[in-house]
Amino acid sequence: MTNRILDMEQMQDEEYVERTLRPQKLNEYIGQDKVKDQLKIFIEAAKLRDEALDHTLLFGPPGLGKTTMAFVIANELGVNIKQTSGPVIEKAGDLVALLNDLEPGDVLFIDEIHRMPMAVEEILYSAMEDFYIDIMIGAGEASRSVHLELPPFTLIGATTRAGMLSNPLRARFGITGHMEYYELADLTEIVERTADIFDMEITHEAAIELARRSRGTPRIANRLLKRVRDFAQIMGDGLIDDSITDKALTMLDVDREGLDYVDQKILRTMIEMYGGGPVGLNTLSVNIAEERETVEDMYEPYLIQQGFLMRTRTGRVATAKAYEHLGYPYTEK
């Protein structure tokens, strides 16, 4: 996969930064108002009844704060949170160890829950629904079934691909939260908050410009802010203003619509080689030398959301906005 500054997946050096910036309470969490408003009600109701919060599924593109939201939920509930991810839970014993370590009301957070092996997932069904698990101990004739009661707990699952969840697993989540790309005003506030925490000087206009080019994604906004700060220190006096922001992002190949060279390559390939489409996903992937899943999951969502690309039954189509943005003449088909 191409190493892009606009990659929505977490890079190796970003875990510490994201932990440092992580809000503790819902009223500190910027954006995602619809999800927050629902969670406030569900959390307060669970606390009033002295019950564990219903199992919660958070889904949406990478970098939008699903992990942060899980930790905020645990803080609001006043309980411990145990964190793991689907690929890490390789066998039933791994999951049993996690479940057996939970206290009443605790949160078990499983990131990338769609990547859990099916054999492990099936153990979760009774754990989520009735708070018990039955496991086999031993092998052959010496094997026996052991019934293990669990304390009431809350499972929070996070996924970028909700469609890959099995129906039985999805049905056991009482609460679902769709994390959406951030509005410009919210992302601007996030940029200014990050700058304040790390003692960076930034003008409001620069924060707006940086947010506008961050693809509606806080992770990208914070990453770009770090890079623009470097430019401000070397090419200026340390102040991040709109001029240095524009120069820095232009040098980083991030245009005014938040598109980088890969996004532009996708659109130019469609326009120059296929007359704007329709183009099949496999054909497009081969032409830009990327995996099909990478194009579908990482590049297309933002291009579609911003109106540069359409998915049709016959393939991908570049829109009039894509032609205009890249300077190509557009003829209505």
Swiss-Prot record:
SMART domains: AAA. Mg(2+) binds at residue 67. Keywords: ATP-binding, Cytoplasm, DNA damage, DNA recombination, DNA repair, DNA-binding, Hydrolase, Nucleotide-binding. InterPro entries: AAA+_ATPase, AAA_lid_4, DNA_helicase_Holl-junc_RuvB, P-loop_NTPase, RuvB-like_N, RuvB_C, WH-like_DNA-bd_sf, WH_DNA-bd_sf. GO terms for biological process: DNA recombination; DNA repair. GO terms for cellular component: cytoplasm; Holliday junction resolvase complex. Its EC number is 3.6.4.-. Residues 1-182 are annotated as: Large ATPase domain (RuvB-L). Has 3 domains, the large (RuvB-L) and small ATPase (RuvB-S) domains and the C-terminal head (RuvB-H) domain. The head domain binds DNA, while the ATPase domains jointly bind ATP, ADP or are empty depending on the state of the subunit in the translocation cycle. During a single DNA translocation step the structure of each domain remains the same, but their relative positions change. Homohexamer. Forms an RuvA(8)-RuvB(12)-Holliday junction (HJ) complex. HJ DNA is sandwiched between 2 RuvA tetramers; dsDNA enters through RuvA and exits via RuvB. An RuvB hexamer assembles on each DNA strand where it exits the tetramer. Each RuvB hexamer is contacted by two RuvA subunits (via domain III) on 2 adjacent RuvB subunits; this complex drives branch migration. In the full resolvosome a probable DNA-RuvA(4)-RuvB(12)-RuvC(2) complex forms which resolves the HJ. Belongs to the RuvB family. HAMAP family: DNA_HJ_migration_RuvB. This is Holliday junction branch migration complex subunit RuvB. The lineage of its organism: Bacteria, Bacillati, Bacillota, Bacilli, Lactobacillales.
